[in-house]
UniProtKB/Swiss-Prot annotation:
Name under which the protein is recorded: Nicotinamide-nucleotide adenylyltransferase
GO molecular function, one term: nicotinamide-nucleotide adenylyltransferase activity
Cystine connections: none
Pathway field: Cofactor biosynthesis; NAD(+) biosynthesis; NAD(+) from nicotinamide D-ribonucleotide: step 1/1
GO terms classed as biological process: NAD biosynthetic process
Origin: domain of life: Archaea
CDD domains for this protein: NMNAT_Archaea
Keywords: ATP-binding, Cytoplasm, NAD, Nucleotide-binding, Nucleotidyltransferase, Pyridine nucleotide biosynthesis, Transferase
EC class (word): transferase
Lineage start: Archaea, Methanobacteriati, Methanobacteriota, Stenosarchaea group, Halobacteria
Reactions performed catalytically: beta-nicotinamide D-ribonucleotide + ATP + H(+) = diphosphate + NAD(+)
Main location: cytoplasm
């Protein structure tokens, strides 16, 4: 049995993430989905809580025939111990999936096999673009699984993003508008 690990902020979980997991599902028996920056929420860059992102992912992946564990991973300010931190929070895994150069480097240094999954329609299937569309009232629902749009509606996520779009919690330009 092979268990994989795929990390992202998933702000929000979108169709590109879903397609990556669909590909990963052909290679592993189980998947640990790491919810990165788990302690951050209610800001322009990280509007959703870890719990809300767990709901998005769990509901969006319900039709997959894949055992999935969604695990919140808080940020560390010490990259040298990050892989140990991830391992301490997750079920054991044999292979990590990422396209982030730092994540790849850290897992390689820890002797963890890393596979780089294809990225899909990155010009629009990107969290910042989806959050910008939410802030501006443009179409974003077509870029996320229906289950994610339902979760965003349930938590008034668009209203939250529009509220924090002009300035972040520290009064700085959020970059969304």
């Amino acid at each position: 049995m092979t268990r994989g690990f795929y990390i992202g902020r998933f702000q929000p979980f979108h169709t590109g993430h879903r397609r990556v997991i669909e590909q990963i599902a052909t290679e592993v028996d189980e998947l640990v989905v790491g919810i990165g920056s788990a302690g951050d929420s209610h800001s322009a860059r990280n509007p959703f809580t870890a719990g809300e992102r767990i709901m998005m992912i769990t509901k969006a992946l319900v039709e997959f025939n894949l055992v999935t564990y969604a695990v919140p991973i808080e940020d560390l300010e010490r990259n040298a111990v990050w892989v140990s931190h991830v391992r301490s929070m997750c079920p054991k895994f044999e292979v990590a999936y990422s396209n982030n150069p730092l994540v790849i480097r850290l897992f390689n240094e820890a002797a963890v096999e890393v596979r780089q999954p294809p990225m899909y329609d990155r010009d629009v299937l990107e969290g910042a673009e989806i959050r910008r569309r939410m802030a501006d009232g443009d179409d974003w629902e077509s870029l996320v699984p229906d289950a994610v749009a339902d979760v965003v509606a349930e938590i008034d996520g668009v209203e939250r993003i529009q509220h924090v779009a002009d300035t972040d919690a520290n009064g700085h330009d959020s970059g969304l508008r």
